[in-house]
């Protein structure tokens, strides 16, 4: 079985388990468009989107390695912001950004918030901050996720934070598939930039 066939099988298995396209996209570190293509592949006239699959489960499933990469993310952000005011809260994007944000918040003794993006909402209307964690209003917030694929989720949370009177001060990711320096004026701090060469 080819890696494409394996990816299609994973997407179809997750879909059969009841996951939404947005949840599958997060699980496989792909765009929603790519997941849609994987689920409908074989239908005439649908061209494959340009995307890159990143499998980082060797790190994400090992708390020692996950802690190490979280520390690297925090160190990268802090090195670029030595003169700036601090951060009050770290916000993890559900699902993969949550463990990273938790470890970063614990390392620096910061509040933790969790954002559920609109793509996880069955109606797909709006995203929200979990009420079980830190409030974000009037706080300087560091946003954490595993990967920038399209940037839509990060644009969504930046706008959400501003509407709720919070100040997004940075976006930390492990992988950036877009090669962006900022999203909506908020600086991006990525450990790795992934570029597709066609």
Curated annotation (Swiss-Prot):
Domain of life of the source: Archaea
Pfam families: Pribosyltran
Keyword check for Transcription: yes
Keyword field: DNA-binding, Transcription, Transcription regulation
UniProt-listed GO biological process terms: pyrimidine nucleobase biosynthetic process; regulation of gene expression; UMP biosynthetic process
Record keyword Zinc present: no
GO molecular function: DNA binding; orotate phosphoribosyltransferase activity
InterPro entries the record matches: GfcR-like, PRibTrfase_dom, PRTase-like
UniProt xrefs under Gene3D superfamilies: 3.40.50.2020
PANTHER family given in the database record: OROTATE PHOSPHORIBOSYLTRANSFERASE, PYRE-LIKE PROTEIN
Family: Belongs to the purine/pyrimidine phosphoribosyltransferase family. GfcR subfamily.
Domains (record comment): Contains an N-terminal DNA-binding winged helix-turn-helix domain and a C-terminal regulatory domain (or effector binding domain) resembling phosphoribosyltransferase (PRT) domain.
Name under which the protein is recorded: Transcriptional regulator GfcR
Organism per entry: Methanocorpusculum labreanum (strain ATCC 43576 / DSM 4855 / Z)
Underlying gene: gfcR
